[in-house]
């Protein structure tokens, strides 16, 4: 790993064992991008990569020079309005109404390690030798705005982290209207665009299309990263598969409004930009003030989609997630929500918890309904004090009873929301986001607290701190059950209303940081009606997230498959729920529900007292299995083998670091009569080790399993005679492979 500056050619070469990233100072002082991809040899200069030719109908920078136009150069952080007609990375409104900027190189600094981003989540290092950072310092002489571009390259992996910082060293305030975290110009457009989109209960489905001339973009203006479009996109070559070929993944470490975009120009070059969504963004930068963008991470792999995903998994597991729970297997939990909804008493909860303890559950979680006058979703939000009618001895009394059983206790909060029927709202009706003289929309009968205001965040912190400090609480589920509307703060002046969305999410991060600092051993799980704010920004504070409110096993296969493109298995909240499923009314077998839920944090979303003795025996066996293999599942090397978006079967697997153990998950959506035999080539095994398949007792070398494949499909002849695999839909199996 190294960052080299060639003074003569003013070229920077950032490289490690896998990638090279080459940029240079162009003749006009702008920064140009020359190359990003597989590692290449270093040399004094790469000027031959600067493509500057005369073209018709082009605006040119220099008098008398018809070859130098920004429109046809690959730029590193393009500006608005000076001969580049593609979308810019930055747009600044000045006092005179101009939006023209010209940032030119003035200096740079190369340091070991990686700096923190004040008030924002970001990847980190524990030792300086893990990364090097380049800070390019540019300046717009007219406004006095200084732009710092940060690049951190990590040792050993194809990872580059980028962000930008603006400092107003001028004599007048300006307004940032657009400030991307990353802009990357690529020399061609021969890519397939992949996005991870959906809706509530159907998040992160894979959508693909070939890049064409024009703009392809996804984003959010909901105040959260959204169910609809995750802040993650992929560009892969058309021939790239899960196991081979070039691919780039772009991930934004941010939980608010975002935009992920690829623009192909008329000469088929591609510009990728990621960052805060410029819609409804307007940040006033007074003299002496600075603004830091969120961090974007780009990963390059020439080992296919699995190679890219594994790089993201390891980075986010080890250098984004922090604290006590980073490297610890997650406890098996039982959440009461789908078992009781709002209809519970303390004794009923203890009854559910007792059965869970009997089955081997380690953590009991009390969900919504424990506070204020919360008997439905119309009342109580914001009043974070125990409802003594339901919990006569408060949260402490219930937590003590759960602890006495030998289990840990967890609790649900929705800190950012309030009901109008609450003491908090009655005391502070101006604490919600709302536009004066206009009606306010509600979602789930609730309103959004103005977390851009410190006094609001302080109040919620004080209430949560009191509960957490007085009771034995080991886990917090932090929910957000609506998106933001009427994004206006009565505490800010008119010329700062464009800051509210970003200030809001900074307030959320501040509350998370204060709570995780005060209670470092509490396991936080983020949630937003399921997967509405499942993003890297949340992982910095909460090591795991509830990826979807849909707990149906068949739907979860698709959701978990898409989610795994970027996010590690240890981050995915996944539970076994009742049937018929509460979201789809679908019935799937208990073993399939568990087989799918294993590949996440694992738990139960039901009242185990309502299961039969046979089902209880199965649950006990499931929990024993999960406890034995959860470290392998949550922290092993994960491979996708067959996609649910491509056919009737889904296969994925996880392999231990020493390659001596592997679990293979096989799932069949629909039963097929008289089907062909199918084999799946496994990945990541040691070719020279012999693996015993615990399902059928067969033994095979790793190279056999990776080249000949594992036989997964039994043949159904039309009669229910196959004892190994029931002749039903939604069937699954786990293969345990152990090296002899």
Predicted regions and their residues:
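Carbohydrate-binding surface patches
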Residues: 233, 242, 644-687
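Short Pro-Gly-centered flexible turn/kink motifs
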Residues: 98-105, 283-302, 730-737
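Glycine-rich, aromatic-flanked loop segments that form ligand/cofactor-binding clefts
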Residues: 69-117, 242-257, 261, 299-324, ...
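Glycan-recognition surfaces
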Residues: 419-458, 502-609
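C-terminal beta-strand-rich structural cap/linker in extracellular carbohydrate-active enzymes
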Residues: 703-740
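Polysaccharide-binding surfaces and accessory modules of carbohydrate-active proteins
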Residues: 5, 9-13, 17, 31-263, ...
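Conserved, mostly hydrophobic/aromatic
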Residues: 18, 164, 288, 334, ...
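Aromatic-lined carbohydrate-binding/catalytic grooves of carbohydrate-active enzymes
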Residues: 325-461, 475
